[in-house]
Amino acid sequence: MKLLLLALPMLVLLPQVIPAYSGEKKCWNRSGHCRKQCKDGEAVKDTCKNLRACCVPSNEDHRRVPTTSPTPLSDSTPGIIDDILTVRFTTDYFEVSSKKDMIEESEAGRGTETSLPNVHHSS
């Protein structure tokens, strides 16, 4: 059992320590790999963490693809999407009562209990 408890953290930490064990990290829009030295037929396109090079196969034309493109808002025309995105406000009504009101209501519902007697203090 102790051996299992020692082996489990080692298996969890192994991919963190040894990069080859967990596989090389992807870079350059997932077309390259982070390595210390590029292999034959690969070109350095960028730098990765820990002073590694982003190695991309040089036989293909790799260009950075923009991740987002601006969407013009002025050219949009109202349509079915506007009907879907319309938010309708509704009002919910809640009845708020205090603890005192709740106690009075519960005492009135019991009917069998008597109220506490008045206590007079003499000075």
Curated annotation (Swiss-Prot):
GO terms classed as biological process: antimicrobial humoral immune response mediated by antimicrobial peptide; defense response to Gram-negative bacterium; defense response to Gram-positive bacterium; innate immune response; killing of cells of another organism; negative regulation of cell adhesion; negative regulation of lipopolysaccharide-mediated signaling pathway
Propeptide boundaries: 65-123
Disulfide feature: C27-C54, C34-C48, C38-C55
Pfam families attached to this UniProt entry: Defensin_beta_2
Ranges annotated as biased composition (Basic and acidic residues): 100-110
Polar residues: bias regions: 112-123
Post-translational modification comment from the UniProt entry: The three-dimensional structure formed by the three intramolecular disulfide bridges is indispensable for antimicrobial activity.
Residue ranges, annotated region (Disordered): 100-123
InterPro entries from the UniProt entry: Beta-defensin, Beta_defensin_dom
Gene Ontology MF, one: membrane destabilizing activity
Highest taxon of source: Eukaryota
Alphabetical UniProt keywords: Antibiotic, Antimicrobial, Cleavage on pair of basic residues, Defensin, Disulfide bond, Secreted, Signal
Cleaved signal peptide residues: 1-19
Subcellular location: Secreted
GO cellular component: extracellular region
Chain's role: Host defense peptide that exhibits antimicrobial activity against both Gram-negative bacteria, such as E.coli and S.typhimurium, and Gram-positive bacteria, such as S.aureus and B.subtilis. Inhibits cell adhesion of E.coli on intestinal epithelial enterocytes. Causes rapid permeabilization of both the outer and inner membrane of E.coli, leading to morphological alterations on the bacterial surface. Binds to bacterial lipopolysaccharides (LPS) with high affinity, and may thereby be involved in immunoregulation through LPS neutralization.
Family: Belongs to the beta-defensin family.
PANTHER family reported for this sequence: BETA-DEFENSIN 123-RELATED, DEFENSIN BETA 118
Protein's name according to its UniProt entry: Defensin beta 118
Organism: Gorilla gorilla gorilla
Highest classification ranks of the organism: Eukaryota, Metazoa, Chordata, Craniata, Vertebrata
